């Protein structure tokens, strides 16, 4: 076999990093142009390139979008350890002209149904209240449907919001929201890389049905002390990073906090003593990202990272004390080890905790409601690349889960009244995987298998999850792709509404609630137009078993038998057209995304006698346009300056809703005038909201001083056309004046809109 012929080959391997801060570069390219060989760095910055052994030097070229190309010669003898540092583009005035290496590599890859997000674009695009948000940018990608307006909910290819595996430095984030879903937990200043898989899932991922959102934090500048920050309308943030020991270890700490509570507190104090003044509730959120890393040896590196975030809502008066807080805590310890030029390993220990608590104290009486989920995970991944055409990945993980579902406590101060309910569950989740990628001339194959198991006494489940993907290069511009993936999900989110609320409950698989299973098939094409535009078309079909929904009239809180409130059925979704046109280079960059899709759920015996219905996230047409234009660059008084215009446009078909189809008038006794009007509900979700349309505009003015201090002012207009989009529809009963008094006579649906045109101004800085 060719990959066993080690005597005739040499291997060049090492890491690729940013020369200014030491950050590893993910997906950077290494090529031997004279031999037609090449490869790229993995998610940990490690690369390996096999070359024919000889006595003549071979030229290697290292490239990465946004960085200067580096060329050098090596003597291909045995194992060559070569760590590379690439210099980023320097001045704001520099025109970085790079061939579309990234787009062409994406076209050639077996990966499909994958999107990556640039943090540079995230910070430039207009945003709600000026708060840049990587999750909201994901909503602009095809195949991803947003939740309600302004929220960070993600419904990927017909899946529910709980079917997204969101990981931060490999630790699971169970609730990625602040402010009831209007902002995400991710501070873009602390994020280095974000990648989302919508299908064709690699075998190393498991545990959710619809997507994997892999977020990786920056590692910290190991060259010098530096910082970034910003001041906006509702929050400020600051990030500091620097070396602990230059070139050997570094740290990063990033903090963000809102300050509306400081203003409301001042207003409340100013109106103390006014009997007609109603106090304003106090609300704020904050989050903190930290990370340190140490180069222990040329072959070993240790990373320690953590995240802590919390939302706090309080309201106090002399007889009433209400507090509602929720948040996440995660921790990761990761060890990278290079066994040799072709074998790399990553060992990770992670901890995740999400909890919420509502506490209310009245005179002589107290009430609290809370829930939490905790994970402790151990994972080992191996990356073996015997030659440039063959890559093997294998590994496994063990996760311990602990769930506390809706713990309710109530009681009086004198002890006469006391009530407590809620249950605690635990479970063990196991996974093992292997995948193999081969390249044969124009054909690349990636196939693998994942074994997942769940143990929760007395239930036990074991499932085999096959994965496969293929890429055939028709020519130097066109590739044909196909993929298949089976996924299992052993934890379920019991959500009482279409919103992503902090009071939603995570619930494990049991004997009565089986794991959800999905199968997805996708086919597509990737075409490189010119050297800067990639056109991607995909069609997909996904079917799901053991889908979880609520029975009509389900009760969640204070219920120790939640399984009795659940209905189990099926779901399917499909799209003949998921299109993306993206341009990453030049003065004008951005993308256009469009999805035509159908989603159906059914076979629930307790819901509409098993009939299929459209869930809330079934939107037929989804169109997004994102544009960033580097309008002008100039130099004045020793300062590099630039002006950038940005815009986004979104169109989404109306989503389904369950509204009354009729009414019944009731009276106190036969023959009397009606005193009550009761709405009558028919089959689920037969009504559709009006279409959602929004245009956002932004302008970014940047200037860089001679001392390297960078500034930018970002002016955003959210909903620039002031369109009143529906947030929800409320049902109102209208009355009629009669000799007998006011009597109800008609039920009307009224649209409630949330956001008009909203301007914002944010100052960002970097030093």
Residues of each region from the PLM?
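C-terminal beta-signal and adjacent terminal beta-strands/loops
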Residues: 263, 642-675, 690-694, 701-767
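Short, acidic, small-residue-rich periplasmic hinge/interaction motif at the N-terminus
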Residues: 15-21, 28-33, 61-68, 75-126, ...
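A beta-strand signature from Gram-negative outer-membrane beta-barrel systems
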Residues: 82-84, 140-141, 185-224, 237-239
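Transmembrane beta-barrel wall of Gram-negative outer-membrane proteins
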Residues: 232-257, 274-312, 323-347, 386-392
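Surface-exposed extracellular loop regions of Gram-negative outer-membrane beta-barrel proteins
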Residues: 355-356, 404-412, 458, 477-521, ...
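Gram-negative outer-membrane beta-barrel transporters
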Residues: 541-543, 564-654
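Short acidic/polar hinge/loop motifs at secondary-structure boundaries
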Residues: 47-52, 124-126, 171-198, 280-283
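Outer membrane beta-barrel strand-and-loop segments of large Gram-negative receptors
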Residues: 375-379, 420-427, 431-433, 510, ...
């Amino acid at each position: 076999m060719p990959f066993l012929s080690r005597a005739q080959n040499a291997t060049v391997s090492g890491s690729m990093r940013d020369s200014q801060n030491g950050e590893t570069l993910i997906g950077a390219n290494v090529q031997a142009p004279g031999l037609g060989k090449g490869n790229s760095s993995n998610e940990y910055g490690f690369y390996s390139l096999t070359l024919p052994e000889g006595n003549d030097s071979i030229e290697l070229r290292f490239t990465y979008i946004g960085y200067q190309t580096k060329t050098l010669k090596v003597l291909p003898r045995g194992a060559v350890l070569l760590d590379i540092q690439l210099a980023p583009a320097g001045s704001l005035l520099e025109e970085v002209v790079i061939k579309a290496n990234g787009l062409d590599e994406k076209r050639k890859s077996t990966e499909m149904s994958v999107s990556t997000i640039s943090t540079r674009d995230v910070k430039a695009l207009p945003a709600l209240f000026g708060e840049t948000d990587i999750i909201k940018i994901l909503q602009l990608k095809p195949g991803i449907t947003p939740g309600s307006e302004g929220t960070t909910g993600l419904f990927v290819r017909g899946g529910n919001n709980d079917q997204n595996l969101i990981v931060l430095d490999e630790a699971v984030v169970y609730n990625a929201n602040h402010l009831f879903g209007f902002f995400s937990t991710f501070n873009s200043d602390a994020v280095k890389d974000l990648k989302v898989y919508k299908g064709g899932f690699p075998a190393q991922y498991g545990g959710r049905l619809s997507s994997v959102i892999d977020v990786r934090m920056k590692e910290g500048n190991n060259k010098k002390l530096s910082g970034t920050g910003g001041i906006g309308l509702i929050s400020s943030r600051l990030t500091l990073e620097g070396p602990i020991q230059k070139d050997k270890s570094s740290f990063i700490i990033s903090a963000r906090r809102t300050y509306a509570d400081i203003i409301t507190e001042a207003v409340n104090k100013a109106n103390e003593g006014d009997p007609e003044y109603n106090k304003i509730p106090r609300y704020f959120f904050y989050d903190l990202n930290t990370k340190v890393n140490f180069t222990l040896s040329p072959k070993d590196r240790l990373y320690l990272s953590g995240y802590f975030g919390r939302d706090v809502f309080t309201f106090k008066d002399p007889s009433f004390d209400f507090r509602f807080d929720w948040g996440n805590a995660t921790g990761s310890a990761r060890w990278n080890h290079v066994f040799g030029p072709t074998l790399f390993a990553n060992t990770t220990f992670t901890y995740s905790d999400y909890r919420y608590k509502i506490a209310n104290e009245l005179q002589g009486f107290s009430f609290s409601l809370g829930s939490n989920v905790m994970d402790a995970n151990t994972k080992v991944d191996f990356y073996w690349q015997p030659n440039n055409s063959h890559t093997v990945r294998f590994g496994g993980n063990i996760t311990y889960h602990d769930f506390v579902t809706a713990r309710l406590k109530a009681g009086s101060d004198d002890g006469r009244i006391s009530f407590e309910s809620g249950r605690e569950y635990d479970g063990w989740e196991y996974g093992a995987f292997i995948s193999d990628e081969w390249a044969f001339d124009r054909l690349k194959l990636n196939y693998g298998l994942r074994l997942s198991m769940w143990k929760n006494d007395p239930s036990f489940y074991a499932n085999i999850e096959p994965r496969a993907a293929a890429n055939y290069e028709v020519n130097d511009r066109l590739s044909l792709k196909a993929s298949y993936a089976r996924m299992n999900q052993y934890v379920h989110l019991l959500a009482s509404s279409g919103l992503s609320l902090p009071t939603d409950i995570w619930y494990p698989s049991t004997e009565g609630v089986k794991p959800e299973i999905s199968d997805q098939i996708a086919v597509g094409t990737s075409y490189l137009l010119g050297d800067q535009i990639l056109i991607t078309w995909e069609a997909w079909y996904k079917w799901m078993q053991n889908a979880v929904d609520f029975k009509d009239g389900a009760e969640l809180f204070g219920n120790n038998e939640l399984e009795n409130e659940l209905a189990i059925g099926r779901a399917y979704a499909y799209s003949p057209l998921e299109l993306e046109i993206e341009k990453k280079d030049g003065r004008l960059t951005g993308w256009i995304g469009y999805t035509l899709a159908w989603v159906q759920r059914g076979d629930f015996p307790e819901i509409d006698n098993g009939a299929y219905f459209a869930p809330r996230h079934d939107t037929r047409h989804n169109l997004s346009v994102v544009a960033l234009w580097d309008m002008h660059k100039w130099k004045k008084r020793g300062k590099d300056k630039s002006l950038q215009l940005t815009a986004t446009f979104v169109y989404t078909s109306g989503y389904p809703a369950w509204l009354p189809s009729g009414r019944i008038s009731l009276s106190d006794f036969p023959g009397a005038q009606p005193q009550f009007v009761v709405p009558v509900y028919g089959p689920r979700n037969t009504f559709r909201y009006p279409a959602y349309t929004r245009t956002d505009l932004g302008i970014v003015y940047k200037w860089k001083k001679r001392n390297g201090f960078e500034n930018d002012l970002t002016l955003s207009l959210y909903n620039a056309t002031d369109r009143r989009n529906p947030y929800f529809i409320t049902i109102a009963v209208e009355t009629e004046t009669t000799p007998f008094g006011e009597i109800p006579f008609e039920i009307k649906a009224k649209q409630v809109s949330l956001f008009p045109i909203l301007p914002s101004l944010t100052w960002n800085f970097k030093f």
